[in-house]
């Protein structure tokens, strides 16, 4: 059984959040929106604030999930992160931009059960 793309993406974000928690991250916010843009996960890794983009794919037949984080997408994430920092986080802090790729390997009753995770820290930088 396969999933519709929206469900797959949501379940991939849930899997990424759980994976980050297991690695010791503290989730600050999920699905932070600013105007038309969104950051999937905002988390603390020790004393670093991480803006995490999650890309989930059912297969890599049409490309690896990391390929979907284009330069344009990076600009949108950076713009949204700046808005978050200005409006909601009023102290100076180290930040970074990470990408988590989730590749589905198995489903059970319409739920993502098995998957591979690839976490790229400092995947891109703000200029």
UniProtKB/Swiss-Prot annotation:
It comes from the Bacteria. Gene3D superfamilies: 3.40.1350.10. Pfam families: UPF0102 (PF02021). One of its GO terms (molecular function) is nucleic acid binding. Belongs to the UPF0102 family. HAMAP family: UPF0102. NCBIfam families: PRK12497.1-3, PRK12497.3-3, YraN family protein. This is UPF0102 protein Paes_0016.
């Amino acid at each position: 059984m396969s999933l519709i793309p929206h469900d797959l993406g949501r379940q991939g974000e849930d899997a990424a959040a759980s994976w980050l928690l297991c690695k010791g991250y503290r989730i600050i916010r999920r699905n932070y929106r600013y105007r038309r843009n969104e950051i999937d996960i905002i988390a603390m890794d020790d004393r670093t604030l991480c803006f995490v983009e999650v890309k989930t794919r059912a297969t890599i037949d049409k490309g690896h999930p990391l390929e979907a984080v284009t330069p344009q997408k990076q600009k949108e994430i950076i713009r949204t992160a700046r808005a978050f920092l200005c409006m909601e986080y009023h102290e100076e802090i180290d930040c970074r931009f990470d990408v988590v790729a989730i590749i589905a390997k198995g489903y059970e009753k319409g739920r993502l059960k098995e998957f591979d995770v690839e976490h790229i820290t400092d995947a891109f930088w703000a200029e």
